[in-house]
Amino acid sequence: MIDQSAFIHPSAIVEDGAIIHADVHVGPFCVIGPQVEIGARTVLESHVVVTGITRIGEDNQIYPFASLGDVNQDLKYAGEPTRVEIGHRNRIRESVTIHRGTIQGGEVTRVGSDNLLMVNAHVAHDCTVGSHCIMANNATLGGHVAVDDYAIIGGMTAVHQFCVIGAYVMVGGCSGVAQDVPPFVIAQGNHATPFGLNIEGLKRRGFDHAALHAIRAAYKIIYRSGKTLDEAKPELQALAQEHQVVNTFLDFLLRSQRGIIR
């Protein structure tokens, strides 16, 4: 179904079965598969390929040569009906690739809303990218990676399979991330190590003095006390009784499967 208000360039291919909502713009030489749904006011500039079971929300801007929903690079994949889900108001720049999920990984690759994926960024199968995130040029997520809200991943950085990048994290460019990066932390290097807290980013996002003080205290408990995580958790729990923001650290540590960067 193609809404009457949508614009489809004569050179574009929109296969039967695709759902194109109001005021969508499909530019020259785009290819839209039969199981694709594109939300209202989304713009595909030119040479964009959207295939597989892929749902794209509203008000996205997708630039030339982006490939969304194509077959993943997991050698176990055997054509199962897995999918990609993309939210609203994302900017997906030239040559970005977002691959469909696998049945072993929950069947879906998800990208939230209000993200900027810069040129050549790659989101592999079964990844979950939150909202308000930035992936700079050539940043690469391995399969099953989770990137929480407001995280920034620098250019040419690679994130290992199954890693978790916490909320408000900043990973510097040309880094290799092989373990989980706790929320609010700046990470850099190969292998990535912690370089303090993303204080300026937190201030821009409205964190007040009390919250910043609590985050600093939690960081010191985790990284400067000399304690193991199991030993540090009671102190973090006590701190969280006074400062709710510390629960972000505690919740993250419960999720972590690969251990945190050190």
Swiss-Prot record:
Matching InterPro entries, A to Z? Answer: Acetyltransf_C, Acetyltransf_C_sf, Hexapep, Hexapep_transf_CS, Lipid_A_LpxA, Trimer_LpxA-like_sf
Keywords associated with the record: Acyltransferase, Cytoplasm, Lipid A biosynthesis, Lipid biosynthesis, Lipid metabolism, Repeat, Transferase
BP GO terms, sorted: lipid A biosynthetic process
Molecular function GO terms recorded: acyl-[acyl-carrier-protein]-UDP-N-acetylglucosamine O-acyltransferase activity
Report if keyword Repeat is assigned: yes
Q: Which Gene3D superfamilies match?
A: Hexapeptide repeat proteins (2.160.10.10), Udp N-acetylglucosamine O-acyltransferase, C-terminal domain (1.20.1180.10)
Catalysed reaction(s)? a (3R)-hydroxyacyl-[ACP] + UDP-N-acetyl-alpha-D-glucosamine = a UDP-3-O-[(3R)-3-hydroxyacyl]-N-acetyl-alpha-D-glucosamine + holo-[ACP]
- Subcellular location field: Cytoplasm
| One Gene Ontology cellular component annotation held by this UniProt entry | membrane
Q: CDD domains from the entry? A: LbH_UDP-GlcNAc_AT
- The primary location reported for this protein is cytoplasm
Pathway membership: Glycolipid biosynthesis; lipid IV(A) biosynthesis; lipid IV(A) from (3R)-3-hydroxytetradecanoyl-[acyl-carrier-protein] and UDP-N-acetyl-alpha-D-glucosamine: step 1/6
**Enzyme Commission number(s) from the entry:** 2.3.1.129
Pfam families referenced in this protein's UniProt entry, alphabetically: Acetyltransf_11 (PF13720), Hexapep (PF00132)
Q: List the disulfide bonds.
A: none
Functional description taken from the UniProt entry: Involved in the biosynthesis of lipid A, a phosphorylated glycolipid that anchors the lipopolysaccharide to the outer membrane of the cell.
> Which HAMAP family does UniProt cross-reference here?
LpxA
What family is this?
Belongs to the transferase hexapeptide repeat family. LpxA subfamily.
Quote the subunit structure annotation: Homotrimer.
Q: State the name under which the record lists this protein.
A: Acyl-[acyl-carrier-protein]--UDP-N-acetylglucosamine O-acyltransferase
